[in-house]
Each structure stands twice: as C-alpha cells, then as structure tokens.
Amino acid sequence: MDFLDRPTMITMLEERMKQLYEHGNADVQRLDRELKQAPNDAEMWFDLGLAHNQCGLQYLEMAFERERLLFLEQHPDAEEEPNQELTVDVPEAYAMFNAALAAFDKVLELMPDYYGVQCQRGVALGNMHRYEEAEQCYLKALEEDEEDFSAAYYLGCTYRDMGDEERASRYFALADQLNPDSTGEIG
C-alpha cells in the first residue's frame, strides 16, 4: 500500500481547510439554504449556530494536524511529536465561532427564552478563549434552569481554563450531582 508523503498530506489538508472555511460543512450549507425559505425559524438558527461551532472545531483540529505535519517535515529527526498547542491564532476558526455567535444572537432575537442558547453561546465564546463572556453565558443559563448540567460542566471547564480550580471543582461537582449517570458526554 502506498502512503502519501508529508508535503502531499499537508497540501491536501490545506485544501480541506480552505473548503471548510469558504463553504462550511454540509450542515451549514443545508441550513443556509433552508433559512432562505424560513428566515424566522429559531430552531434552524440554533442548529446553524451549532453547525458553525462544529466547523470551527473541525478547522482547529485540522490546523493542529497541519502544524504537526509541518513540524515533522521541518524536523525529520525529531524524537517526539510537537506539543499540540498552536503557536499562532487561527482567525478562520474564530470567524466560524463568531458566525455561531451571530446565529445564536438571531435565536435570541426571535425567541429570547430559547432553551440552551446561552450555554451554546458560552461554548462558542470559550472556544475563542473569551472566558469572562463565556462565564456570563453559563451563569445566565443556570439562572434560567438551575438543573442545566451542561452549563454547570462547561462553567467548570471555563473556571479551570481561567486557573480557578476551586470554582471549577464546585461546578464539576454540581454537574455530576445534576446528572450522575453522565459518562462525561456533554451535549
């Protein structure tokens, strides 16, 4: 079986990244078409926000892989893989997260009490390291539903990322209390 060389893999990955950035995934494309027919459908806007957020995460994953391949190409004798932290910002992924925020804001405009939108706004903000804003979204989600274990869990993640282990622990415990059967799968 023939394997692709690293330069070819990098080129293919860059092309996939370009396609994702320019066109989104199949869900984004479908929802964009459907929203032209039903521009006031809050549920579709919510789904579009989720799809844009997912595209941003996919783009970041590809950016990590691209950086790893570039490192290995430039350091063929390296004994270990590079650290999985990007050395530069990825504005394309941030654009996708901002598109998610715009969709979630449209949901709030159409239906201010739409369940789950504050938590998902927090996820998109957290993906951009805008932790203070994410924190406010999760707190608002918990005000709206004190049993929203996803909001409690993500608030714990936000506090952990902010370096506040005490509050992180408290909200992880709350999430576990709210959903003791959870296996760590948050949606």
What are the language-model segments listed below?
Residues 34, 106-107, 140-141, 174-175:
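Canonical positions in the second alpha-helix
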Residues 37, 110, 144, 177-178:
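Structural marker of alpha-solenoid helical repeat scaffolds
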